[in-house]
């Protein structure tokens, strides 16, 4: 899992902007198999074939974006539906690169519906924002009765491997997690500009260029669980993390780092530790991460 990218400057003309949409639907078949029963794509978003490294009950799939990056004017939409009793593990093969803007914002919307007693592991690789990238990101997740979810998002500002800082640009983000009754469990709206003083402020990013959030959702996600996790989380000059139970059944781990590798290791470790507790299944590292 690496955020290292070669030094390139890519600005695609607005006339060639991609508008892409991917729909995925999982259903429970006789015998308890989770099947990828619906897939539909428009434009350059795809899903690789379903895999079952953990047996028929858990369907693994990899979402791919062949262009490799997102430029100004691009619009990506991902719609995922899990029927009752299914279990899906979704990831991506590499970082999503957000290129220098051509004067237009790049946009992404992710909409996920997790049915009753369904389980989801949402494990994308990180977002990597090039200098002068302008992006708008929206993420909405709805939970059915008895559903559980483990997922994360991770962001890197600037291409560290190329010696590039994120000195210009903006990121507008909106995240919402909704419970079975339709009541919001967690809502966050933010706008980060490259010149924002909060990037250096201790109550903001504290000078870190890498940050991420892991969310754990389900009946097992209690204040007591958060308190049991907190003592082992790092808090030093290289990596800082904390955990909060923001609502019954809703636990967040948030972290800041100077390198994406350190953040990804932390997120993966916490996901593996939480999986037996939240989903009731064995911890199993993704094969994709081992290639």
UniProtKB/Swiss-Prot annotation:
Cross-referenced InterPro entries: UreD
GO MF term set: nickel cation binding
Location within or outside the cell: Cytoplasm
Signal sequence span is: none
Look up the record and report any one GO term of the cellular component aspect: cytoplasm
Q: What is its main location?
A: cytoplasm
Q: Which domain of life is it from?
A: Bacteria
Record key words, sorted: Chaperone, Cytoplasm, Nickel insertion
Q: Please name the Pfam families in this protein's record.
A: UreD
Keyword Cytoplasm attached:
yes
* Quaternary structure note: UreD, UreF and UreG form a complex that acts as a GTP-hydrolysis-dependent molecular chaperone, activating the urease apoprotein by helping to assemble the nickel containing metallocenter of UreC. The UreE protein probably delivers the nickel.
Q: Which HAMAP family match?
A: UreD (MF_01384)
* UniProt similarity note: Belongs to the UreD family.
Q: What does this protein do?
A: Required for maturation of urease via the functional incorporation of the urease nickel metallocenter.
Protein name (database record): Urease accessory protein UreD
- Species for this entry: Burkholderia mallei (strain ATCC 23344)
Q: Which gene encodes it?
A: ureD
